[in-house]
C-alpha cells in the first residue's frame, strides 16, 4: 500500500512541476522553398531550448518568465524576439527563416559532405556564384575557373596550386563533381568542361589540396564540385542569346582568313519551378563556333532536367539527366611561327563526333532518429567517334554511393560514412582494339566535432580497392584538420591530407598516333601517392554593407611516383619514328607555396560591387633532381614542367544605376620548363624540330602574359539586359599551353531576359 501511495505522490508532484512550466512548440521552414529546416536551433535566454527534428518541428518546456527567443540555422539570418511565458501556457511558434546571402555566411557542402559555413572549414575552399557565370557569358566551366586564385587550366587540364602540369588529355589529379557525383571520363579521367550545364548552376565549390580521404583516387590535388540549381517558391525562366566575332591577331601575318571572320553564336534556356511536392529544373544550350584556328569548328547542343519529389518530410527521390551531342575538330600544335601560329600542323587536326549522357537517380531519407541515408547513382556514357576508327572511343561508367550521416546535437558532432562502387567498360581501338574494364570500391568515414563553440576538428579516412585488366591494388588514406574561430569573423585553420591516384586505362594502355608522333602504352605504370598540408587564416571584413573574406595561406604538397605524360624519344617501341608521348613515373616531387586572396560582395554606398582577387606563388621541384629528369626538361634547373610560378587573378564588377561594368585581369609568369623534345632539334646541331618554332617563340615571349577582359551591360529593366563582352581586350598574342595560341580579341553581344 505504501508503494502505491508513493507512486501516486510522485505522479502528482510531476504534474505539479509540469504545470509550473510553459510549453513552447512549433515549426521552422525555409522562407523561399517552404521546406522544413532540420537541425535549426530554438533557444531561450535561460538556456532552455531544442533543435528541430526531421519534419522541422520542435517542442520543449521552460519556466515562466520574460525571455529572449532566438532561432538560428547555418546559412540563414538569425531571428530574435522577446517572449513572455506564463505557468501552464502552450505557445506555438511557426517561423520562416530567410537565407543569408552575405559572403561572410556562405554555406558549402564539399569539404565535409554536410552544410557548413565557409569560414569554419578546415581546408581552403573558394566559391563561384551563379552571377559571375551569367554575367561573363562563359560557355565552358574552365573559362570561369581561370578567374579563381590558385587555379589554372592548361588545354582542358585543371591544376590547383601547381599540383599537376599538362597531361595531354589523360589522368586528372583534380576531381570534377556535379552534384557530388564524379563526371570524369571512365577511360582517361578527363573533365569535359563543355558538358557542365552552365545555364543551371547554383554555385561551384573548389577545394584546394588532397581530398582523397572523402572523394577517392582522382582527388589527389583537390576537387571542383558543381552544385546545380533547384527552384524556389517563385518560378524562374531565363533566356540568353549571344553572337561574337574574333578580331585579327596583333601580328597580322598570322591572320589566315579574309573577310569571313571567325565567330561564335549560341543560346541557352533555363526554367525552375515548384509544383507542390515536385521540383523541376530544366535547361538547354546550343553553341556554334567557327574557330580562329584554321579549319577548326565546334558545334554542340545540350539539354538537362533535374527533378525532386518529396514523398513526405522524411523521404525525397529524384532523377537528373544531362545529355549532349557535339561535332568538332581539335587543334594539337601549330605549323610554324612565321604565319602558321593559328594553322594546325599537317596531319594533327582531329575530327570528333560525340554523345555524352549522365543519368542520376537518387534517394534521400531521414529516419525516425534524424539520421540521413542517401543513395546516389550515376550512369555516364561517353561515346566519341573520329574520322579514323583507330581513335574512336566508347566508354561507360556506372557509379553508386551510399551515405550515412548522424548529428550528435548534445556533443556538437557529426559522423559521416559511406561506401562507393564504380565500374567502367571501354571498347576502343584507341587501346589496342581491346575491351578493358576497371573497378573501384571504397569505404570512408569522417568525424567532425566542435569544441567550446569555436574549435572545429575534422578527421577522416578512406580505404580504396582498385582493379584494371587483372591488376588489383588497395590502399588507405587519411586526413586531419582544425579550424579555430579567434573572433567573430576570424578563422585560423590547419590541415593535412593524404592523396592517392590509380592509373587510368588511357595512361597504361593507350596506343595511337598523331601525325608522325606516337602515343605509347606503359603497362608497368604504378600508382602515385602523396600528401598536402596547409596553414591559413581567413579574416572577414565589412565596409558599409560590403562584405569580404581576406585569406592568407601557406601550403606544401609532396608526391611519390608522380605520373606524367612525357614527350620524348622511345626507341624500344619498335616504330619507324619513335618520338611521342608516354605516361611515366617521374619520381618524387615537392611543391611549396603561398597564396593571398580577397573575395567580396555587397554595396559601397549605393553601388553593388563584387571582387575576386588573388596572388599565388609556387616552387615546384623534384625531391631528387637527377640527370634523367634534367634531360627530359627544357630547363637546366630543378623545376617541374608546365607550371607558372607566379599567377595573379583579378575580377571586379560594379553596377551604377542601369550600367553594370566588369573587368578581369589574369597574369601568368613565364612557363620555365616544358618537355625537352619539344624544343630540342631531332638531330643535334640542326634546325629540324618536331614542333617548328617553339624554342624561338619561347625565347621571344619569356616575360609572362597579362590578359585583360572587359564587360559592360545595360540593364533595360528588371527582366531585360544587353551586354558587350570583350575578351583579350588588348589583343595580346599569347600561349598558355606550348605550341597552341590562345584566342585573339573577341567581342560578343548578348541579350538576356529573365521572366
Where are these regions (language model features)?
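Short, acidic, small-residue-rich periplasmic hinge/interaction motif at the N-terminus
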Residues: 29, 33, 41-43, 72-76, ...
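Membrane-embedded beta-barrel scaffold of Gram-negative outer-membrane proteins
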Residues: 241, 374-378, 382-384, 485, ...
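Flexible loop and strand-edge segments within Gram-negative outer membrane beta-barrel domains
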Residues: 289-366, 372-373, 379-397
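A beta-strand signature from Gram-negative outer-membrane beta-barrel systems
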Residues: 195-240
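Short, acidic Ser/Thr/Gly-rich low-complexity loop/linker segments typical of extracellular
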Residues: 47-57
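Gram-negative outer-membrane beta-barrel transporters
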Residues: 240, 453, 555-558, 582-677, ...
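Extracytoplasmic beta-strand/coil segments of soluble accessory domains associated
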Residues: 61, 125, 142-181, 185
